[in-house]
Design a protein with these regions (language model features):
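Structural signal for conserved beta-strand scaffold positions within catalytic alpha/beta enzyme cores
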Residues: 16, 64, 161-163, 218, ...
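FNR/FR-type flavoprotein reductase catalytic core
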Residues: 79-223
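Local cysteine-cluster metal-coordination motifs and their immediate loop/turn environment
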Residues: 199-200, 221-256
Length: 265
């Protein structure tokens, strides 16, 4: 995993908001410093209201970078996310970023990348695909949700869909779909898996990757109040890299991307 060092605390301006369905919105804002330094897997912490409510900033994966503009995907779950999703062009926001580490697209050597995501977990995958394509990697998306309303494929290519209710694509979950696909994919050359989504999905994927001997990195989600290691709101328990015992980690500092083998299943 690659770590980010060029962090800025910036005032930015929203240039557009667009509903993508399923209570998810695409928000674009201008912030040259963050756009210049963003890597796949990084996130930003955003405060939209200049008052003290909501008190904590909200973390969002960086979805895409276009020139000086940064795009995020946000799901309206009330509070700060509602303010952001309903904001109009010209709204001023406060943004810290880029934060966290990034997906490692260099090692171990691989020719095909499988990007597994669930629901809003597709958020970081567009920027990741762009960087992988620049390195001439084959990219396959495996995307899951409860129904077609949970599926978001904006900017993504070569997508394989799984829905639990069968309203789109394969009927079942992403692990079942991946299990059906993986044999043929592995025949084409070395594979590395990258993932973001609900914790149960990530834990199941960690087990599957271990079973198949696949290198796998996952982006974890938790509460991140400050994003810079001060509030200690994002502590997670992971296996030690040695494989023996566990230890606590500040996800905003040493994550959100971790090796899947460290997840406690």
């Amino acid at each position: 995993m690659h770590h980010q060092s060029e962090i800025t605390d910036s005032k930015a301006t929203i240039i557009s908001t667009r509903n993508l369905g399923g209570e998810v919105s695409l928000i674009a804002f201008t912030c040259p410093d963050i756009a210049r330094n963003a890597l796949p897997g990084n996130f930003v912490n955003i405060k939209i209201n200049p008052s003290n409510q909501p008190l904590l900033r909200r973390p969002f994966s960086i979805h895409n970078v276009d020139g000086d503009n940064v795009e995020i995907m946000a799901k309206n779950i009330g509070g700060g996310t509602a303010l952001l999703c309903n904001a109009s062009a010209g709204t001023a926001i406060e943004v810290i970023g880029p934060l966290g580490n990034a997906f490692n697209i260099e090692t171990p050597a691989f020719s095909t990348a499988i990007l597994v995501s669930g629901g809003i977990g597709t958020a970081p995958m567009m920027l990741l695909e762009k960087h992988l394509k620049a390195e001439e990697k084959e990219v396959i998306h495996v995307i899951g949700g409860r129904s077609r309303d949970d599926i978001h494929t904006r900017g993504l290519n070569n997508c394989h869909i799984a829905t639990e209710d069968g309203t789109e694509g394969f009927k079942g979950n992403v692990i079942e779909l991946l299990r059906n696909m993986i044999g043929d994919v592995m025949l084409e050359g070395p594979v590395k898996v990258f993932a973001c989504g609900p914790n149960p999905m990530l834990k199941a994927l960690a087990g599957f990757s271990q079973e198949r001997g696949l290198s796998c990195e996952v982006s974890l989600e938790t509460i991140m109040g400050c994003g810079i290691g001060i509030c200690y709101g994002c502590i997670v328990e992971l296996k030690n890299q040695s494989g023996e015992g566990t230890s606590s980690m500040l996800l905003c500092q040493d994550g959100p991307v971790v090796d899947a083998s460290r997840l406690i299943i």
